[in-house]
Amino acid sequence: DLFGKELAVLFQLEVDGKAVCVSDDAMEATQCGPIRQNDLQQGEVYDARLKGELTGWHGVRTAPNTLHLIGMNTVPIREQEAFAGRLCRTPNGETVLDFGQNMAGYVEMKLTAHEGQKICLLCGETLDENGNFTQENFQDRNRHKEGGTAQLLELICKEGENHYKPSFTIMGFRYAKVETDIDLTGAEFTAHAVYSEMPVTGSFGCGNADVSQLVQNSVWSQKGNFCDIPTDCPTRERAGWTGDMGVFIETGLTLMDCYPVVEKWLAECRLNQYPDGRMANIAPPTSRPGYMTTMLCMSAGWGDAAILVPYALYKRTGDRKILADNYEMMQKWYAFLLGRAQQTTEEQQTGEYAQYTVLNGLDYGEWCEPG
C-alpha cells in the first residue's frame, strides 16, 4: 500500500491487441486480492474466494523514494521439473504427500471443496527415524526467524473446483503434511522445482551406484540453491554465504552454466565489501548486522571467495570482463589479508611462508561445521 510521487515505470496492458489499462499519474489507489499473506520462505496464505474483480479501492501511503533503481541483471527463474505427489499415512496417523525428490519449489493443488474449507500443507525435507513428518532438521527456532521456518501453504477454498499454486514463495521439501477436512478423492498435487535458468553442461555416470547418486545429489543441491543467487540451503537461512560458493564454484560450473547467476551475486559481494577490504560473509545481507558480524568478516576461506570465484569464472570462460569487474574487490581483500599476516609476531613467524601466514584476528574455526 505504498506509493511515491516519482513514477519509474510507464506501462500499457494489451489483450487481443486492445489497450485495457494504461498507467498515468493517478496511480493512487490499492486493494488487497486473494494473496492474504506471503513470505519468500515462510509460505503463502491464499483466499480463493477473493479471486476476481477487485472493488473497494482505498488510498495509499506515500513513502520517500531513497533507492537507486537499476535494470535486472540476471537470468529468468523458471518452473523446471514436476513431480506428482503420492498420498501416504505415517505411523502417527498423519496424511503426507511424498513427491519422491528433494527440491526447492512449491506445490500446485487441484481439488474440489466447499466455500470456506481450508487445506494446509506443511513442507519438509525428510521423515524422522520413525517414519513421521518432521521439520526439525532445519529449525533453529528464534535464531533467524521468530518461531522458526514455517514452510506453510494455506488455501481457503471457493465453492467447487479450486486450482492454486503460489506466486511469491519457494521452499525446500520432498514431503508435505496435509491438514484439512476436505475429501481429497480425485485431488491432484504436483511439486514444481523452481530455480534460475541454467543449461546443463556436464554429466557423470559409473558402475558404482553410490558414487553416481552422490553426483546426482550435487546436481539437485545446485538446483535447490540457485534461485537468483547461490545460497547455502533452501530452508533455514537460505543465505548467500561466500564460503559455500568459494568451495562449490568449480563443481557448479562443471554441472551447469551458472555463470550469469554467479556474476550477479559477485556484484552483491562488491557492494557489501568493507572499506578496509574485509568481505561480508553473506551477500546480499539477510538481516541487520550483529555484534559478531564485523569481527567474523575477516574470516579466511569465506572472504577468499572474493578471489576464488571470479578467477574460476575467468578460467572456465576466458572472459576478462569478470576480472575487470571484480579486480578492485579482489585486490582489497588480498591487501587486507596481507596486512593481517604482517601483524604476526617474530616468535610466530616460522617456515618459508611465514610472512603470508595469518595467526591473528578472528576466523570461523573448528567449531564451525564445513559448508
Predicted feature descriptions by range:
Residues R236-G246, D257, C297-A305, D325-E328:
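Aromatic- and histidine-enriched alpha-helix N-cap/loop-to-helix transition segments
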Residues T251-P275:
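Active-site diphosphate/adenylate-binding microenvironment
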Residues V247-C258, A305-I322:
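Well-ordered alpha-helical scaffold segments within catalytic/enzyme domains
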Residues V247, E268, M329-Q343:
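Alpha-helical scaffold segments in carbohydrate-active enzymes
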